[in-house]
Regions:
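Short boundary motifs at domain starts and secondary-structure transition points
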Residues: 80-84
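PAPS-dependent sulfotransferase catalytic domain
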Residues: 88-178
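N-terminal/domain-start segments enriched in small and hydrophobic, helix-friendly residues
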Residues: 66, 85-86
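Short, high-confidence coil segments that cap the C-terminus of an alpha-helix
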Residues: 1, 86-89
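PAPS-dependent sulfotransferase catalytic core
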Residues: 1-79
Length: 179
């Protein structure tokens, strides 16, 4: 297994899911840097909310991922690998993967895809509480533009995540150990 793909709408707490996997010995953590961290006290205490590379339109990596299905496997892997220099499985996180589950499954059939879902209003509320457009990493303002557009995008991403879950099934972990 070369990659673990993760899809979740902003505010779905998908980054928390990723952190539970990230510190495993088998994960390549070379994408981590102080520039790729976001700390916030939304939970009541200062906590690391985002760590490592995020891939989405308008962000540091994955600018073309809105149309990822128009690119070759080799072009995609070159972009996946760009922030990494180490060994191990690479976690590739993208909100827009929600719309491209079929493409990921077809091109990387041996790589797991983690779908993180949370109700639309809960996603938007948590994202706003965590800093919304003031979040310093990853940057949301270029692609997501404003709160109205963000709300629509969260709805669309969650819809496609639920549809992919219905199409492909999978496991629903009961706790962090199941991850």
């Amino acid at each position: 297994m070369k990659y673990i793909f993760v899809a979740g709408a902003p505010g779905s707490k998908w980054s928390s899911v990723c952190k539970n996997i990230y510190y495993s010995d088998s994960i390549d953590q070379s994408d981590a840097s102080e520039n790729r961290e976001y700390w916030h006290d939304a939970s009541g205490q200062l906590d690391l909310m985002h760590i490592g590379a995020y891939f989405d339109p308008g962000m540091e990596f994955g600018d073309f991922f809105g149309d990822i299905n128009k690119y070759t496997k080799e072009e995609c892997e070159a972009e996946f690998d760009r922030p990494f220099s180490g060994e191990g499985v690479r976690i590739i996180k993208s909100h827009v993967f929600a719309h491209h589950i079929d493409f990921l499954k077809d091109n990387w059939p041996d790589c797991p895809i983690i779908l993180v879902h949370r109700d639309n209003d809960a996603c938007l509320g948590w994202w706003v509480r965590c800093g919304h457009f003031d979040i310093t990493y990853p940057l949301y303002h270029k692609y997501y533009v404003n709160l109205r557009e963000m709300s629509k995008i969260v709805d669309d991403q969650n819809r496609d995540i639920v549809n992919a879950w219905k199409r492909y099934g999978g496991i629903s972990p009961k706790n962090n150990i199941d991850l």
